[in-house]
């Protein structure tokens, strides 16, 4: 088992003046992936990007996470991504990887649960709780989001969530209940 950090969780502070760049961390991860039977990349959204009481500005993952996944997948054809977070994200690298495990917000036992799934000790049986769109532009809230400081307009009527995508006959990456 070889570990490589791959990216930083948050932006540098004054005390971090000597830390490696994201590009250097990605390069280390690529080198580790080249010799591995399987490369497992952990990415997603931390409390720096989403949380209770505030909205995200985009459904994109951090650029350094996307760059890391693509670079590792290019170096190792057997790349599996473990995605953490509490909401939908775009995954431009999805066609480049062998597998995806959406671990959600795992809490204190999340690491053990992910390890049990990755090693085959348990069979994952969860289903998606949201529809994963192909882009933000096909989302029913596009054009109304993010709203104002105290208001949020929901103009999709009863066609919220998966009902919108079904009624509009839109292709999606993962439908509600997938898995």
Please give the residue ranges for each predicted region.
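Extracytoplasmic/secreted envelope proteins and their assembly/folding machinery
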Residues: 26, 30-33, 66-69, 111-115
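Glycine/threonine-rich flexible loop motifs
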Residues: 43-63
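Secreted, periplasmic, or luminal enzymes acting at the cell surface/secretory milieu
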Residues: 2, 6-7, 12-17, 21, ...
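Short, glycine/acidic-rich beta->alpha junctions
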Residues: 20-25, 60-64, 109-110
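A motif-centric signal for short, conserved binding hotspots located
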Residues: 72
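A short helix->loop->beta-strand "cap" motif at the edges of active sites that frequently abuts
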Residues: 75-79, 97-98
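An anion/phosphate-binding loop that grips the pyrophosphate of nucleotide cofactors and donors
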Residues: 36
């Amino acid at each position: 088992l070889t570990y490589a950090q791959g990216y930083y969780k948050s932006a540098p502070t004054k005390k971090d003046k000597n830390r490696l760049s994201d590009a250097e961390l990605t390069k280390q991860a690529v080198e580790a992936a080249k010799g591995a039977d399987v490369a497992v990349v952990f990415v997603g959204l931390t409390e720096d990007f989403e949380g209770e009481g505030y909205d995200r500005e985009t459904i994109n993952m951090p650029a350094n996470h996307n760059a890391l996944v693509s670079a590792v997948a290019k170096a190792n054809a057997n790349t599996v991504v473990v995605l953490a977070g509490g909401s939908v994200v775009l995954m431009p690298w999805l066609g480049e990887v062998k597998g995806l495990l959406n671990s959600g917000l795992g809490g204190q036992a999340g690491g053990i649960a992910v390890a049990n799934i990755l090693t085959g000790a348990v069979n994952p049986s969860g289903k998606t709780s949201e529809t994963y769109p192909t882009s933000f532009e096909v989302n029913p809230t596009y054009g109304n989001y993010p709203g104002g400081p105290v208001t949020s307009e929901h103009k999709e009527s009863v066609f919220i969530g998966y009902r919108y995508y079904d009624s509009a006959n839109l292709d999606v990456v993962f439908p509600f209940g997938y898995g």
